[in-house]
């Protein structure tokens, strides 16, 4: 869980900015949105399979694009 220590000379805005940065780095908001509604295991596997295919096609596209430049 993110947390910061506020120094006496630190303003509220600065402390808030540091806290928001930690929250963004830890992907807390993204995970909370993903867990907002229950997702069945079959739906999760389906999404993972689609994401893996998309990633593989992107790598293949980039590889072919790189090879065509040689």
UniProtKB/Swiss-Prot annotation:
Keywords: Ribonucleoprotein, Ribosomal protein. One of its GO terms (molecular function) is structural constituent of ribosome. GO terms for biological process: translation. Belongs to the bacterial ribosomal protein bS21 family. This is Small ribosomal subunit protein bS21. Gene3D superfamilies: Ribosomal protein S8 (1.20.5.1150). The lineage of its organism: Bacteria, Pseudomonadati, Campylobacterota, Epsilonproteobacteria, Nautiliales. The keyword Ribonucleoprotein applies. Transmembrane segments: none annotated. One of its GO terms (cellular component) is ribonucleoprotein complex. NCBIfam families: S21p. The keyword Ribonucleoprotein applies.
């Amino acid at each position: 869980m993110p947390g910061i220590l506020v120094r006496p000379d630190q303003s509220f805005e600065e402390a808030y900015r540091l806290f928001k940065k930690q929250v963004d780095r830890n992907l807390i908001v993204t995970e909370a949105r993903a867990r907002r509604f229950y997702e069945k295991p079959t739906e999760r596997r389906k999404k993972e399979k689609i994401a893996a295919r998309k990633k593989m096609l992107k790598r293949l596209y980039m590889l072919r694009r790189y090879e065509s430049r040689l």
